[in-house]
Amino acid sequence: MSSKCESVKPQLVNEVLGYWDLLKPKIMYLVVLTGITGMIIAPGNIHPFIGIISTLCIALGSGAAGAINMWYDSDIDALMQRTKNRPIPSGKIARSTAIELGLVLSVISVTVMMIAVNYLSGILLAISIGFYSLVYTMYLKRRTPQNIVIGGIAGALPPIIGWTSVTNAISIESLILFLIIFVWTPPHFWALSLLNYQEYEKAKVPMLPVTHGIFTTKIYILVYSIILFIITLLPGIFLKDCLLYETCAIPLGMTFVFHAFKVFVSINHYKYKAMFTYSIAYLFILFICIIISSF
């Protein structure tokens, strides 16, 4: 009896971890942080309970989009070294289970957001899930090298959703936060695509290095990084502690551009990986700086 229990435990743990991975938790963490940032810097007050509900809905919505993405992309995930161990290709989770979970979480997150918070936030959450799942995953990703650029709209919406959870309105401040994430997304993913362009080519995914070459991709990364640096100066206009924010944002942005420049002049894969890794830390730190500078 005890041996049976011991054999069931690892299986159960693997299944639970499979479900968790299906929700793309690394993306979820960033989505939640940017959503909370929108809530914190928005004018007015939000009841703590409503804030928690809004945060949970944003997290569930992100997880729902991740599950639908993994369901649809399971065929190409199985072909790529980087993604072959994801829950569906590895056999941890069935494809049918993934889409069912994604749809259920989508309905729950949007419905609860509409009822408990406000309709505008619920509608924006639905747009974010739908854009990532339908427009990016099912249409853009396999058809155009601009997949990441246009698809970035979905990932850039959470700070607006957080803002509208408090104000029930969209403002220029929330749009600036949207713009930061929107412009950050392409160089972040293009750095990853430089690392794995041969796998994308094998899976017939038209990422920029596959369709336009490595050199062109490097130019795009550098240009977008410079534009991002300029845009990240804008929150200083409306944050309470402008000096503190700019003291953080300027060196962070300069380092981002420096990494992009190193990618541009190098053929070393370690530079590509360093750019990708830094870009993740960069956005986390930048949005934490925005939160701190709002007090």
UniProtKB/Swiss-Prot annotation:
Q: What else is known?
A: Carbon 2 of the heme B porphyrin ring is defined according to the Fischer nomenclature.
**InterPro entries per the UniProt record, alphabetical:** Protohaem_IX_farnesylTrfase, UbiA_prenyltransferase, UbiA_prenylTrfase_CS, UbiA_sf
Metabolic or biological pathway: Porphyrin-containing compound metabolism; heme O biosynthesis; heme O from protoheme: step 1/1
GO MF annotations in UniProt: protoheme IX farnesyltransferase activity
The residues forming the signal peptide are none
The gene it comes from is ctaB
Q: What Enzyme Commission number(s) apply to this enzyme?
A: 2.5.1.141
According to the entry, what is the taxonomic lineage of the organism?
Bacteria, Pseudomonadati, Pseudomonadota, Alphaproteobacteria, Rickettsiales
Name of the protein this chain belongs to: Protoheme IX farnesyltransferase
Name the source organism: Ehrlichia chaffeensis (strain ATCC CRL-10679 / Arkansas)
